[in-house]
Amino acid sequence: MLTSKDFRDQAINLIKKWNNIIDEIPWQWNQINELNNESKGYFTTKRYHKINNNNNNNNNNNIENKNNNNIENFEEIKETIDDSSTTIIKSNNNNNENNIIIFQFDIIYSKSYQVPVLYLNGFSSFDSSPLSWNEIWNNLPLSNLDKNQQSTIPYITQVEHPILGNPCYQLHPCETDNLMKLILLKEKDYNDNNDKKEYFKDYYLLSWLSIIGPMVNIKIPFDLLKNNNI
């Protein structure tokens, strides 16, 4: 389990390190102060992505059935995702605006599950209109993994944003805790100089994001993973 304090501390540290490596499209921490004086927040970023038109017709009929499945083999996902599928694409050419979409990613701490949860939305870069679920799904690497039956994963459901209140999509966190226990114990074998508690506290969020990120077009900087032995 991850505490809310650990989440905040790790998020702020991760944002600083990430933005020092890649600052074109930075992460930022949004602080929220509630009426009961409880302080909380979340971190957020955007990614610009070239529209994938190849799979639209093939995927549309199967989307509903695909999203009723769950995930089991996360390590296979990490090994099989092609980095080219998560390339950030930016364009200042107005003629290309219709071919670029914007993904908005928010990572928020869940008190119920005591784990980080990823929320996402997609928008047109041309007029900022929200994308349909089909348009979002067809442009996520996750859709290709599902189609090829390479693994099963915690699937995306439509929910209300827990802080902003707008409709968005959530990568369901029900198996996150079990997943992270396995990953952190495995990574602990390579970090004999750290006791279990310290390693858990320092690397939980980055380890989680290194698995979840490539599924949704978030490419983790190699130097960030290398410097933290992930």
Curated annotation (Swiss-Prot):
<feature type="active site" description="Glycyl thioester intermediate">
    <location>
        <position position="174"/>
    </location>
</feature>
<dbReference type="InterPro" id="IPR007135">
    <property type="entry name" value="Atg3/Atg10"/>
</dbReference>
<comment type="function">
    <text>E2-like enzyme involved in autophagy. Acts as an E2-like enzyme that catalyzes the conjugation of atg12 to atg5. atg12 conjugation to atg5 is required for autophagy. Likely serves as an atg5-recognition molecule.</text>
</comment>
<dbReference type="GO" id="GO:0019787">
    <property type="term" value="F:ubiquitin-like protein transferase activity"/>
</dbReference>
<dbReference type="GO" id="GO:0044804">
    <property type="term" value="P:nucleophagy"/>
</dbReference>
<keyword id="KW-0072">Autophagy</keyword>
<keyword id="KW-0813">Transport</keyword>
<keyword id="KW-0963">Cytoplasm</keyword>
<dbReference type="GO" id="GO:0061723">
    <property type="term" value="P:glycophagy"/>
</dbReference>
<dbReference type="GO" id="GO:0000407">
    <property type="term" value="C:phagophore assembly site"/>
</dbReference>
<keyword id="KW-0833">Ubl conjugation pathway</keyword>
<dbReference type="Pfam" id="PF03987">
    <property type="entry name" value="Autophagy_act_C"/>
</dbReference>
<dbReference type="GO" id="GO:0015031">
    <property type="term" value="P:protein transport"/>
</dbReference>
<keyword id="KW-0653">Protein transport</keyword>
<comment type="similarity">
    <text>Belongs to the ATG10 family.</text>
</comment>
<protein>
    <recommendedName>
        <fullName>Ubiquitin-like-conjugating enzyme ATG10</fullName>
        <ecNumber>2.3.2.-</ecNumber>
    </recommendedName>
</protein>
<keyword id="KW-0808">Transferase</keyword>
<dbReference type="GO" id="GO:0000045">
    <property type="term" value="P:autophagosome assembly"/>
</dbReference>
